[in-house]
From Swiss-Prot:
Assembly and interaction partners: Homodimer.
Entry protein name: Histidine--tRNA ligase
GO molecular function: ATP binding; histidine-tRNA ligase activity
Gene: hisS
Entry similarity comment: Belongs to the class-II aminoacyl-tRNA synthetase family.
PROSITE patterns in the cross-refs: AA_TRNA_LIGASE_II (PS50862)
This protein's UniProt keywords: Aminoacyl-tRNA synthetase, ATP-binding, Cytoplasm, Ligase, Nucleotide-binding, Protein biosynthesis
Enzyme class: ligase
Subcellular location, record wording: Cytoplasm
Natural source organism: Salmonella choleraesuis (strain SC-B67)
GO BP terms, alphabetized: histidyl-tRNA aminoacylation
GO CC, one annotated term: cytoplasm
InterPro entries: aa-tRNA-synth_II (IPR006195), aa-tRNA-synth_II/BPL/LPL (IPR045864), Anticodon-bd (IPR004154), Anticodon-bd_dom_sf (IPR036621), His-tRNA-ligase (IPR015807), HisRS-like_core (IPR041715), HisRS/HisZ (IPR004516), HisRS_anticodon (IPR033656)
Annotated catalysed reactions: tRNA(His) + L-histidine + ATP = L-histidyl-tRNA(His) + AMP + diphosphate + H(+)
PANTHER family registered for this protein in UniProt: HISTIDINE--TRNA LIGASE, MITOCHONDRIAL-RELATED, HISTIDYL-TRNA SYNTHETASE
């Protein structure tokens, strides 16, 4: 017997019972994006490797440890995308979408990182991201955060997420702080773990978000990044906080929040939860005003965020179980008798024409009434249409409410109107 081939570790199948809740959540997210004027952009999952090295940073964990990189048959180095912003910027430059233009874009799809798989963290995972180009004020930063807050309300999870904010300033401000932080860490190397010692010279700001409690205690004595902010960044951040206060959005300023990708500047933010164990970040983003120019375009202000859909689905299921998927089927058509199948299929097609939004499944594979009604229950149908030889002969169909058990014989010509009443 041939050996079964299974999915790659950390790359999961999502089966019909799971995808239904995904579809409902994604529909909610997309509706809110549309209400803010965002347009979808669809991007390749494979890009040239230098794109990510230049955008994310050569000495980040993503580039050093986590990317799926390979040579194609032409000898070109390609990478499965580990995040979406770099590809979105590349597309904007390539197709002339960014220079002297305002763009509000969103994308959705799989990303890939070679990490240790655990609940809420996978090697293939799905993100929804939104990016805004051409606007540099704190007002658009605030609107992006307001958009995400509207998502949480729509999904019934607003009480289970909290917003953390910081400003990491300009490139020059971070360089000055970096020097001061390295000097401080060099004096306390005995407290640092091996990972922090490695980061101390390659990417010292990442020491700030170390999970090591001894390192976090040590950092209480270090100077804060906020002490080194340039005046423009300080003013920008104050403006953002004022707008969020006016909108009634609660937040915590976390001066150790730096984000793991090198392209960020000024505003950074995360929505976090305590309901998913160690995988607490649900949505994160910030401003990246230098990235378009860094990737070959003209200087363009930009801000955006990305959200992990696996974690969002887990969170919705954990804290709002009433947010359930729509049933696969609204109506199940039961056909009994050798001469009824053709009539049943004809009636089903007519109802699909007259009721475009209805989910109607016709029974196939035969079976007596008991088996067919069991199938209707399996698919979650609210209504069964019963068509036997006598109904075919007199042009009627029996409409049965599967919740109340009530049933009525209705003329086939008027059954669509009757169904609309029942379905609301």
């Amino acid at each position: 017997m041939a050996k079964n081939i299974q999915a790659i570790r950390g790359m999961n199948d999502y089966l019909p019972g799971e995808t239904a809740i995904w579809q409902r959540i994604e529909g909610t997210l997309k509706n809110v994006l549309g209400s803010y004027g965002y347009s979808e952009i669809r991007l390749p999952i494979v890009e040239q490797t230098p794109l990510f090295k230049r955008a994310i940073g050569e000495v980040t964990d993503v580039v050093e440890k986590e990317m799926y990189t390979f040579e194609d048959r032409n000898g070109d180095s390609l990478t499965l995308r580990p995040e979406g912003t770099a590809g979105c910027v590349r597309a904007g430059i390539e197709h002339g979408l960014l220079y002297n233009q305002e763009q509000r874009l969103w994308y959705i799809g799989p990303m890939f990182r070679h990490e240790r798989p655990q609940k809420g963290r996978y090697r293939q995972f799905h993100q929804l991201g939104a990016e805004v180009f051409g606007l540099q004020g704190p007002d658009i930063d605030a609107e992006l955060i307001m958009l995400t807050a509207r998502w949480w309300r729509a999904l019934g999870i607003a009480e289970h997420v909290s917003l953390e904010l910081n400003s990491i300033g300009s490139l020059e401000a971070r360089a000055n702080y970096r020097d001061a932080l390295v000097a401080f860490l060099e004096q306390h190397q005995e407290t640092l773990d091996e990972d922090c010692k490695r980061r101390m010279y390659t990417n010292p700001l990442r020491v700030l978000d170390s999970k090591n409690p001894d390192v976090q205690a040590l950092l209480n004595d270090a100077s804060a990044l906020g002490d080194y902010l340039d005046d423009d960044s300080r003013e920008h951040f104050a403006g953002l906080c004022k707008l969020l206060d006016a909108a009634g959005i609660a937040y915590t300023v976390n001066q150790r929040l730096v984000r793991g990708l090198d392209y960020y500047n000024r505003t950074v933010f995360e929505w976090v939860t305590n309901s998913l164990g160690s995988q607490g970040t649900v949505c994160a983003g910030g401003r990246y005003d230098g990235l378009v120019e860094q990737l070959g375009g003209r200087a363009t202000p930009a801000v955006g965020f990305a959200m992990g859909l696996e974690r969002l689905v887990l969170l919705v299921q954990a804290v709002n179980p009433e947010f359930i998927a729509s049933p696969v089927v609204d109506i199940y058509l039961v056909a009994a008798g050798a001469q009824t199948q053709s009539a049943a299929m004809t009636l089903a097609e007519r109802l699909r024409d007259e009721m475009p939004g209805v989910k109607l499944m016709t029974n196939h594979g035969g079976g007596n009434f008991k088996k067919q009604f069991a199938r209707a229950d399996k698919w979650g149908a609210r209504i069964a249409l019963v068509l036997g030889e006598s109904e075919v002969a007199d042009g009627t169909v029996v409409v049965k409410d599967l919740r109340s058990g009530e049933q009525t014989a209705v003329a086939q010509d008027s059954v669509a109107a009757h169904l609309r009443t029942l379905l609301g």
